[in-house]
Swiss-Prot record:
Multifunctional enzyme that converts the viral RNA genome into dsDNA in viral cytoplasmic capsids. This enzyme displays a DNA polymerase activity that can copy either DNA or RNA templates, and a ribonuclease H (RNase H) activity that cleaves the RNA strand of RNA-DNA heteroduplexes in a partially processive 3'- to 5'-endonucleasic mode. Neo-synthesized pregenomic RNA (pgRNA) are encapsidated together with the P protein, and reverse-transcribed inside the nucleocapsid. Belongs to the hepadnaviridae P protein family. GO terms for biological process: DNA replication. GO terms for molecular function: DNA binding; DNA-directed DNA polymerase activity; metal ion binding; RNA-directed DNA polymerase activity; RNA-DNA hybrid ribonuclease activity. The gene is P. Residues 201-365 are annotated as: Spacer. Activated by host HSP70 and HSP40 in vitro to be able to bind the epsilon loop of the pgRNA. Because deletion of the RNase H region renders the protein partly chaperone-independent, the chaperones may be needed indirectly to relieve occlusion of the RNA-binding site by this domain. The lineage of its organism: Viruses, Riboviria, Pararnavirae, Artverviricota, Revtraviricetes. PROSITE patterns: RT_POL (PS50878). This is Protein P. Residues 305-318 have a biased composition (Low complexity). It comes from Duck hepatitis B virus (strain China) (DHBV).
Amino acid sequence: MPQPLKQSLDQSKWLREAEKHLRELENLVDSNLEEEKLKPQLSMGEDVQSPGKGEPLHPNVRAPLSHVVRAATIDLPRLGNKLPAKHHLGKLSGLYQMKGCTFNPEWKVPDISDTHFDLQVLNECPSRNWKYLTPAKFWPKSISYFPVQAGVKAKYPDNVMQHESIVGKYLTRLYEAGILYKRISKHLVTFKGQPYKWEHQYLVKQHQIPDGATTRKINGRAENRRRGDPAKSISRPHDPKRGCNMVRQISNNRSSIRPCANNGGDKHSPTTRRLACWGGKASRINQSYSSRDSSAPVDARGRSESAGSLSSLSGRKAAGNHHHSTLINPSVETTARGRSTPGEQISARDTSALPESRASRACNKDSSIKEENVWYLRGNTSWPNRITGKLFLVDKNSRNTTEARLVVDFSQFSKGKNAMRFPRYWSPNLSTLRRILPVGMPRISLDLSQAFYHLPLNPASSSRLAVSDGQRVYYFRKAPMGVGLSPFLLHLFTTALGSEIARRFNVWTFTYMDDFLLCHPNARHLNSISHAVCTFLQELGIRINFDKTTPSPVTEIRFLGYQIDQKFMKIEEDRWKELRTVIKKIKVGAWYDWKCIQRFVGHLNFVLPFTKGNLEMLKPMYAAITNKVNFSFSSAYRTLLYKLTMGVCKLAIKPKSSVPLPRVATDATPTHGAISHITGGSAVFAFSKVRDIHIQELLMVCLAKLMIKPRCILTDSTFVCHKRYQTLPWHFAMLAKQLLSPMQLYFVPSKYNPADGPSRHKPPDWTALTYTPLSKAIYIPHRLCGT
């Protein structure tokens, strides 16, 4: 082929070949442009292509990719209807056809330690992020509440009781680790561990009163908010006829005190009995008992306390009546910080109505429940006796089926009428990661243990995140994993730590969620730095998962699912093999359900940057997913997908960005197109028909790429420069994307475009040239720009 750089190129064989390529490109456009401009060329009928005779298991991939792409534009895949179709594609299945979870009655609750980071971190790691984290706040616009009995999802219908029992143990473990509040009453919760400074103002302090009764001093005030009189205890002498000692307590609540032994929605039926009360009148009291509540610290409305030897009664005059109605609270209150409060004791005459275990404990005057390191908190909110999220258990992972993982479903805050718009945060894509990673440095990765449980919540926000095991209600004191706000908070948390680590230890640091990546040119220095970093974080109360931490500097590391060595990034070979196996099992002409296709596209998207393909090649499957219809693979389309997985490539870290000087320019009018070279050569072509100007411009740029193969091209079409061709026919868009992806396109105003003259039958003008790239610069955080 003669070089297209001379004045006489319009008379050469090159021009005739260019005309041939132009007609082929125009045929690709015209085959579907008139009918559907916005949809790919896919038949929606019943003419399902049958598999060819002797269809090979391994598709023929010896042909170049460009030939395979053109074959796929002729033998098109098909969209179908919404009738039932195949739900399995190799080892993949539709999202609603996933293998159900298997219940394991021997599940163990994993060890969960108290993750309480020291607020000294605000001084050690100065950052504006801490104002969003100490404490974090969660304010949904609207909330849907569910009954306590629905706290555990019916994931395992044959093992409901066992499932709830293990969930209860899991929540108890979280409570003991200081991650959950436990509901005592509408205004009172309890928690374990060390309180944060913003919780101190809501802590409830208990003081012993000489006569044996107990009152509570809240924020330094021991007075009744409603009546204004000081809290006091009035005891009546023992009456042998009644067999009970009545103790009157002042209530700080606006409403009468109700029994809270059933706090959290006990599933047992309430026991009704009559007791003799003040004034010789009988009042009917409904009390609920359960084996769980008998040993748990309970407070009625957070104000009435157990008092002395027998049941404490709160007596109030009822409006319009001449007798006193009394409500009985059988709750047992334990004290904070090891301080004991006399427990409730019930006379032998009344214990017959209680369960045997409860009666035996209640009759024991010497037994008092003591819990260490327990704090009572009356938050600046009410604590609802209902839940906002549901729970269930699954295996911890595919390799560890002996331990359980708690799944928290707060999906009401991310979809439906209560959906919230959570803040966006910077997350590196593959292109960014390639540009920020340093080349040729040893690396160490650190992993936070229980990362989300480092993030404390405001007590008022905790009341919006209520869960239950079916009996008791708990609230998340730390950020749960099932809320869309938690990843944003974790990003702020690790970013603040990473910035300080990079500054203090003079090491390149990158953080993503709970992963830290440290790089330094000297391996021995990096090894010592990693130990110092771990010590620094642990002194601040931040826990490191040493099982997932690199013990010493390495040259090849797995980070964010990629294999990263000193110069390149790649994907593990096992992942390629699995994907090729799935493609081999595609049956040409068979209908596949769109949910199954959705999973398949997810796997292809991850590996696509490491191939010579582009996203336009997957658009037919995206069309099936968008329209929720079945999909059928053609033989050529299956070959194309297999060809992509065979052309595996590694991506260079820190790719050299070159800005080549433009030597070729293109321009188009509705009827003519032109290509101009900086040496003065030019060629003018006549289109077969009039089309939209942006299509004519793209045709000329593709033709210039095919015939001249320049490193960059000048064009005055912003549509072409941005390389977003979704509105074009699928096969033409795929070919254009394939041709133009690896090269630079510069925008030049029409008045300065050298090819503007030849398209209007005038000589080209390269004297005054002004151009600019329109590609958006990749955002990189400032602290990572210097590497």
